[in-house]
Amino acid sequence: MAAEQLNGYVLHRRAYRETSFLVNIFTLENGKVSAVVKGVRGSKSDKKSLLQPFQPLLIGVSGRSELKNLQQVESTGAMIRLAGQALYCALYLNEVLNRVLADEIPHPEIFVLYQQSMHALVAQTNFEPVLRSFELGLLDALGYGIDLTHDADTGQPVADNGYYRIVPELGCVYQGDIRLSGCYSGQSLLNVASENWDKDSLLAAKHITRTTLGELLGSKPLMSRELFKQTHFKSRGREL
């Protein structure tokens, strides 16, 4: 059987049996693909050196089951170079995608979003808007996006001077003109919807996406988030 050619990035790699790897690769054409890479552990093969996160790849896979055989791999461009906080953010993106994407369901819009987000992490020093935009785009693409511009009960446009509560699987619901615990200002929600970032809209977006993504990710902690907490970034009051 001829190998199917796919463009993608490694999301996760782990040891498998004595000499092999299991890799999860996010591809443009087929979404997340899981594959066995045989006979590369402990060697200096090109496959092993190329199967790294943030390296754009062209891979060749074969097999009829969900677990493919990776037959070939080559670079299609320079590795995206990340360091410090940007690296932790990129590892977070990889881990989220690896956890929430089902095998072999194409998501070309998420693939483009992922590439854009990775390059934005390289180019910017304020990473939080990149993460929040990625999370919102991911939720929208998976069908879990929340309409932050209209009241879920009445259908009326969100009022910038009102306060709203986010109801899971429903949307934002008007609570009155006085701020209550757990509510967000209409202006903050409108800013999140338009990705017009300031301190309040970033905080609102973090709470909203963490709640919604949490349902998809499950109860197991994200390793990238735990690693981030163990670094000096915690002392600066930052978290993913």
UniProtKB/Swiss-Prot annotation:
GO terms for cellular component: bacterial nucleoid. It comes from the Bacteria. Keywords: DNA damage, DNA recombination, DNA repair. Pfam families: RecO_C (PF02565), RecO_N (PF11967). The keyword DNA damage applies. The keyword Transmembrane does not apply. InterPro entries: ARFGAP/RecO (IPR037278), DNA_rep/recomb_RecO_N (IPR022572), NA-bd_OB-fold (IPR012340), RecO (IPR003717), RecO_C (IPR042242). GO terms for biological process: DNA recombination; double-strand break repair. Belongs to the RecO family. Involved in DNA repair and RecF pathway recombination. HAMAP family: RecO. PANTHER family: DNA REPAIR PROTEIN RECO. This is DNA repair protein RecO. It comes from Pseudoalteromonas atlantica (strain T6c / ATCC BAA-1087).
